[in-house]
Amino acid sequence: MVHSEPIIRDNDFYGFIEVVDRPKLSVVICMVKHDDYMTPFSAWEDVSAYIPRHLTLWEAFYGDGTSGAHLTELGFDVIHEDVDFFEHDLGECVVTNPPFSELPRVLARLRELGKPFVVIMPCSTLTTRYFRDLFPDIQVIVPRRRIQFRKLVDGEEVPSGRCSFDCLYFCWRLGLPRDVVFSTRWPFLPSRQK
């Protein structure tokens, strides 16, 4: 027997639990979405030297609004509005941290837009067929350290512990000096924790 029940636990996630009953065996499968993780200032600071300053950036996923503010603080011209990425086409270069549960849709939309982009995604994205088929000519920037995202629950920041996976900056049509670039601290950027 298989049945699904909606679940909400501690406002930390949503999804469903599927319970499969078998003789002497009960298996629980949990489908969870964790998309409310915000980009810290340091994540954009680390790659700001590679983001084109002559283009208007579109921070396409609004979140709590701070990511666009961080990019503006770093000196970029940024469009950061709370609009649907799948229905709008803004700016000249997409710079964003999309909801990871929506990556296939996000990547298809990025390909459709045809704009240069810098997108933070898990390293494992590189090994997926849908990604390879859409962007065989991708370039990546490897961060100096693991990105520690800020977790929001109902609009409030909550302690989230250390991030358990690595992310890369996936870049398309930026003309980076190499296909794999290792990020370093740039001397002309002030270091700031946020």
Language model: regions and residue ranges:
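Class I S-adenosyl-L-methionine-dependent methyltransferase catalytic core
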Residues: 1-194
